[in-house]
Each structure stands twice: as C-alpha cells, then as structure tokens.
Design a protein with these regions (language model features):
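Accessory nucleic acid-recognition modules appended to NTPase machines
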Residues: 1-81
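Residues immediately flanking
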Residues: 12, 87, 127-128
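Arginine/glycine-rich "motif VI" loop of SF2 helicases in the C-terminal RecA-like domain
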Residues: 51-54, 103-118
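Active-site ExK catalytic segment of metal-dependent nucleases
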Residues: 76, 81-93
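Mg2+/Mn2+-dependent nuclease catalytic core
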Residues: 90-110
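Short, hydrophobic beta-strand segments that form beta-sheet elements in well-ordered domains
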Residues: 118-126
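Domain-level recognition of nuclease-like catalytic cores that cleave nucleotide substrates
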Residues: 125-149
Length: 149
C-alpha cells in the first residue's frame, strides 16, 4: 500500500494562534477551520491507534497515489489488518469522501492487481453530523464527538 507519514501539530490551536485568529475569524474562514479540524482528528486518531494491540511502526498514515486518489488516514496493524478514514468538516462532503473510500477499496483489494486484503472498516469522520450511521457495506459516518476513550 502506497502510504506516507504526514506531519501534524500536537495541538491544532497552535496553528490557529500563530495565524492570529480568534474563534469568530476561524468560523468565517471555512478552509482554515477544515484544516484545523483535520489536525484535531488526526491527533485523536494517533492517540487511539497507539493504544491498539499489535500496532505496527507508524500505524497511522496518509494515502495518495499518482492518479490523485487521496485518503486522509490509513490505520494499519502489524498483522496486516487496516482501516481507511476520511475527515470532512461538514455533512456536505460525506458523499465525496465515501466515493474516495470506495475507489481506494476497488484499487487495492479488487481485480487482477489486488495486493492487499479488504479493510476491516472504512469511515468518514465529520464535524457537524447529528449521529453515527452506516452508509454502505463496511462504510460508516462518525461525528467527532463519538470518538471517545
């Protein structure tokens, strides 16, 4: 699987403070808010992944291929089990994220060129969803507030 580590700040508020943004300014700048939200989710996912049994070296990575397919997070255990997660601030972007996850699954797991096993699950983590739900076989939408220890 062509994954790469991606670097994030330990606390996304550091970047927001460095930009001199207060909460109102951040809410007006949806792109920066989305980047800070992704950083927040990644921080939490890194902590949760480290607590998993059979965790490998650099278990949380980013996927991008030459065809432009991007997936925000791949979590892989040492035994080869893996999950793919997209991170989207708003519910409006869930369909695009689900399509990216489906494309990743088709590319890596199906057809003559398949080189890896099916993911254990795939999910879209959102900022403003009302509830967690299953949108397709093995694909879930999970509001960030549902990610608790």
């Amino acid at each position: 699987m062509a994954t790469k580590p991606k670097r994030y700040l330990a606390d996304p508020s550091l970047a927001v403070a460095q930009l001199g943004m207060d909460p109102q300014a951040l809410m007006r700048d949806y792109q920066t808010l989305g980047l800070a939200f992704e950083n927040l989710c990644m921080r939490d996912l890194l902590v949760y992944a480290e607590a998993l049994p059979d965790i490998g070296f650099e278990p949380v990575r980013y996927y991008r291929d030459d065809a432009g397919l991007e997936v925000a997070t791949i979590i892989e255990l040492a035994d080869g089990r893996w999950a793919a997660l997209e991170i989207k601030l708003s519910e409006d972007k869930v369909d695009d994220a689900v399509n990216s996850l489906r494309r990743l699954q088709r590319k890596l797991c199906r057809g003559d060129a398949a080189r890896t096993r099916e993911p254990e699950f795939m999910a879209v983590i959102t900022g403003f969803s009302q509830y967690a739900r299953q949108v397709d076989e093995n694909i879930y939408v999970i509001p960030i507030r549902c990610l608790t220890a």
